[in-house]
């Protein structure tokens, strides 16, 4: 903070000092600034990701002030760290200056972006709020005023303003010395009080005068610190009523309700406006009659209240204090102009100041005594407030264009690169058009990242930034980055970059899916998002083939157990697994004895040793379960087909035209194979189409034809159903049974059992109804009894099925 209040510059950013001690300090400062730079880069990256993925999005395409507030906090931490750099080092001074400026840039932008939201609630009743919300130029100047007050406040309190305020709060009156003198007994002329007086217009004792001067100085600093109300209360408590009243008048200009939108006698708006106008005119006459006493503490205070620019500029020893001088006067002028109680000519005479933020900052930038660092601050704020992003890009490139990573003799401080790289990146992420200057800065930033992280291309951001993270944070941060990617193309690019950077992509992908599963338990992630994230495993090749198939099975189980069941999503998941040839990849992994990763939560690590029995067991079960779940879909399709042709009740959702087009329509395909699981869907689709046509024509197909077709379907589906019932991949008592290390498969086993209980009773009941309708109960009886009551169902469902059969007069014992 202190550097921004200095009037000169003593840094050169060079290491040409011949003095060994100075060189050692510069070396140390460079070393520690590199650490600050690395940590700052990581934090800024997180904020940029949050911005890019919409965390800071608010209506009307704006960015939440929260982003700038968080950046202010980050920069403040770095600024505090730079204060600990070795004193007397040029690089220390340079680092602290840039850290200071980063704090102030974030501060003014956080204030500016928040103003419209803060004043929105009173915009219908307050002129001040209306100006803030609807007049963007007023909002910019007001932001400069509030920012400069905040910065001055921090600086003044560091210098002991708080102690001075507390001292005044402990004094009963500004005439305390007169009071004490008048209380003393007087026994002679020599002891009589000379200048003691309780009259506020009388000079009072020298001690009184010194106390009042100190109070005026404190009030002045409180005004510039944005604490006029505190100054007013303090003045009144000290018995300085006249000053207190004027301070109260000034403080009212910050209260939206004290500046009503519509002036009337009811809200005293007319009186307030006219008297405020007269007050400023009267005060100006008094200042003119003071005959050059502007340096007096009282007149300095009055000039601050009045917005008299020249004394305030003279009192301003730093750029921020001069910003306050201009902004204070400009805000007063704009408010008085909006109130309309004073002519524009009178306002121009009273407040001969620039009335736009750009003109104010241009005025300050034109002063020759400003240092390069302060010039950077003013120009960046000017560009950002006025959306002159092209100039920001140009200036950024001019300032950091010569940066060389890891070069202690580089004339560009690495913290300057952090500031401009992030400002340009934020502008890009906010929708501003890139240009050559902006791109040059982005490339410089990525060159720096590559120099510290090694191998990866700057186009693959995640790989670069992961190099800066502590080892224990690397995997979680990569996983969070992977979560934010929402397109298949981006996933493949990022996956390739992670692999090229020697990062264990398979472990990252498995960790991501583990977190998604946990999020699923707490209902904070949608099914669609889970399917999208599953793509990370699908593109991992043989290494993640087992994990991909396990996650595929979990997603299918999840949809099967949802209410209502979305059959199309189940088919979508299976198609995706087959499109990426997951079963084939898994078979190749076994043949190649490749290391595979598993998500089965049995207490083992992700990585499975090639050829180990546990790995083989997991692969076999995942494959059997996958084909078992596909069999549920196939059998269900045939059951729906049979129900439609026999007019039996069976719950289903019609196939959409889009999905029908995806599978090639309802016609039989010449190249259909035994492994074509879509064949059953086309059979069902033809049945649905036939039913719709019959409804439209109001004519059913000939009975014998229909019976013959159903019989063909039964001949096909019964072997499939037998295989499904006996498939140990969907029999929970096999691979999913409790183990020596506990019962890690309990949830998985429960889901499989629930699926069996849900689907198999429906299948057997429909088959029984079909057997009765076809008068073929004998064959059905043989089929059912061949299972010896071992359908892998809970006992209650076996009882339910047999009870239903009894109602149909089917004997199955």
UniProtKB/Swiss-Prot annotation:
PANTHER family to which the protein is assigned, alphabetical: NUCLEAR PORE COMPLEX PROTEIN NUP107 (PTHR13003:SF2), NUP107-RELATED (PTHR13003)
Family affiliation: Belongs to the nucleoporin Nup84/Nup107 family.
GO MF annotations in UniProt: structural constituent of nuclear pore
UniProt KW keywords: Cell cycle, Cell division, Centromere, Chromosome, Chromosome partition, Kinetochore, Membrane, Mitosis, mRNA transport, Nuclear pore complex, Nucleus, Protein transport, Translocation, Transport
Protein name: Nuclear pore complex protein 5
Annotated transmembrane regions: none
Organism: Caenorhabditis elegans
Gene Ontology CC annotations of this record: kinetochore; nuclear membrane; nuclear pore; nuclear pore outer ring
Superkingdom of the source species: Eukaryota
Gene: npp-5
Function: Involved in kinetochore assembly and chromosome segregation during embryonic mitosis. Required for the localization of the NDC80 complex member him-10, the chromosomal passenger complex component air-2 and nuclear pore complex proteins npp-23 and npp-15 to kinetochores during metaphase. Required for npp-23 localization to the nuclear envelope during interphase. Recruits mdf-1, a component of the spindle assembly checkpoint, to the nuclear envelope. Appears dispensable for the assembly of the nuclear pore complex and for nuclear protein import.
InterPro entries linked to this entry: Nup84/Nup107
Membrane topology: Peripheral membrane protein
GO biological process: cell division; chromosome segregation; kinetochore assembly; mRNA export from nucleus; nematode larval development; post-transcriptional tethering of RNA polymerase II gene DNA at nuclear periphery; protein import into nucleus; protein localization
Disruption phenotype: Larval lethality with about 9-12 percent of animals reaching adulthood. The few surviving adults are sterile. About 10 percent embryonic lethality. Reduced nuclear growth in P1 embryonic cell and delayed entry into mitosis. 39 percent reduction in him-10 kinetochore association and 34 percent reduction in air-2 chromatin association during metaphase. Loss of npp-5 localization to kinetochores during metaphase. About 10 percent of mutants have chromosome segregation defects.
Pfam family membership, one: Nup84_Nup100
Annotated localization: Nucleus, Nuclear pore complex; Chromosome, Centromere, Kinetochore; Nucleus membrane
Binding partners and assembly: Part of the nuclear pore complex (NPC). May interact with mdf-1.
